[in-house]
Amino acid sequence: HGNTCPVMLSSSAQASLSGRFEGSVYGESKLAGEGLFREYSERTGAPVLIYRFPNLYGKWCRPRYNSAVATFCDAIANGRPYTVNDPSVELELLYIDDLVDEMLGALLGEEHRCGYDGLERVEGDDFCFVPETDMKSLGEIVYLLGCFRDSRETLSVPDLAEGSFSKKLWSTFLSYYEPGNFAYGLKPNIDDRGSFTEFLRTPERGQLSINVSRPGITKGNHWHMSKWERFLVVSGTASIKLRKVGEDTEGNPFPVDEYVVSGSDMRAVEMIPGYTHS
């Protein structure tokens, strides 16, 4: 009927029939589908967008079906058994949000085009692709997921750099916790002065802790050579005092710098290196 509306085919990397996909019946069926779409394009003049998607992953993907990442996420998050036959096997991984971004671009005629030489992407326009993919081994994936699971004990925060594989896998992993398992306990250190509880730790940006002080209690009275801290009172009122270590040119102690802060008027106070603080 003269309809030349563009059509998109969700094919698979297995259609290359290369490497470990050689002889894949599933790949052969996808390759046959690509051929039918090309014939349709030649017959009608309708543009065809053929995407050979690699391994997709993202929140709520069905485990124990056709996604290794989903299977590992579900098993490791919920204490189920799993098997890694060969940790060295590498997968090209495509995050679902990146796929959606590409599909929205394709609707606007902004798809990314390429050719293929086996599994290798080359210059060309016979196919479409999503630029944001990651090559990771099964061993790397399982190791990261184990770190994510253990983070409730270690309090560590993974690499959450924008666009990083770690951030995408972390968001995916969290979605596999079952309802009722979203909360976990912390370990407060309690004494007569109050309590100190670590909440988060990062390898490059320090940690976040909750410090509860009883009325009239003084904590601190020490200083650091290079360590830096930032205090924020969220409940009650506190007097935070700092004094530069050493003496001035006349041999007198440096003056005390005092900040009275409260939970009703939140202000962050820097614990400057080289200053005693309490």
Label the model's feature ranges.
Residues 246-278:
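Short acidic-glycine-tyrosine-enriched beta hairpin
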Residues 180-221, 227:
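A short glycine-rich, His/Asp/Glu-containing loop-to-beta-strand
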Residues 226-248:
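Glycine- and acidic-residue-biased ligand/ion/polar-headgroup-sensing regions
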Residues 1-31, 41-44, 49-51:
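Conserved Rossmann-fold NAD(P)-dependent oxidoreductase catalytic core, especially the SDR/UDP-sugar
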Residues 93, 222, 228-233, 268-269:
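His/acidic/aromatic-lined binding-pocket segments of jelly-roll/cupin-type domains
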Residues 105-188:
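Mid/C-terminal beta-alpha module of Rossmann-like enzyme folds, strongest
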Residues 16-19, 59, 248-250:
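Short, solvent-exposed loop/turn segments at secondary-structure junctions
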Residues 35-91, 96-109:
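NAD(P)-dependent short-chain dehydrogenase/reductase
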